[in-house]
């Protein structure tokens, strides 16, 4: 569903202490942004922020970068993050939110950033053959991620789409990743540590099984 234009979104984001206006300026320097050497985790397509707000607020020993493209959705994520941290009385020191085109993620990250973990949750499946190169798990993208993933860095991937999941398994293998965990029914698998996204709850209510894998950089 398309979000309505929110004129207040960009001014609110620019006034936010954890929003990064020009992320490409910090390519290779993200540890300096956070002011420590803690491992950095990255969510590509953070949406309304339900996932990243819980993950970041409960892992203060990690740093988090959350990326999406639309100001309207990022403004909702900003509010979700602020509320989640307020609930536990914590400061938003370990998270940064930004607008950036994910297909061009290499413009804001490089090998000096050593990302420990990437999360891709319920991305657009792009089912038509002519659009498949736009998938966030397509080899074109995976090869970008490899450049800034740390040794043994991981990609955690969730989807409700069977075709995308099956194709993505091939993509990961093709791009020299080890698949270290895989299930076609996450919520029946006994896997611990899952944080549900807004889309995930919706798909579960519809009776969909959630597919999930962890791929590790060789």
Curated annotation (Swiss-Prot):
Record field: catalytic activity: guanosine(46) in tRNA + S-adenosyl-L-methionine = N(7)-methylguanosine(46) in tRNA + S-adenosyl-L-homocysteine
Keyword DNA-binding: no
Coiled coil ranges: none
Keyword field contains Mitochondrion: no
One MF annotation (Gene Ontology) recorded for this entry: tRNA (guanine(46)-N7)-methyltransferase activity
Signal sequence, renumbered to the chain: none
Function noted in UniProt: Catalyzes the formation of N(7)-methylguanine at position 46 (m7G46) in tRNA.
Family listed: Belongs to the class I-like SAM-binding methyltransferase superfamily. TrmB family.
Identification of the protein by name: tRNA (guanine-N(7)-)-methyltransferase
Organism ancestry: Bacteria, Bacillati, Bacillota, Clostridia, Eubacteriales
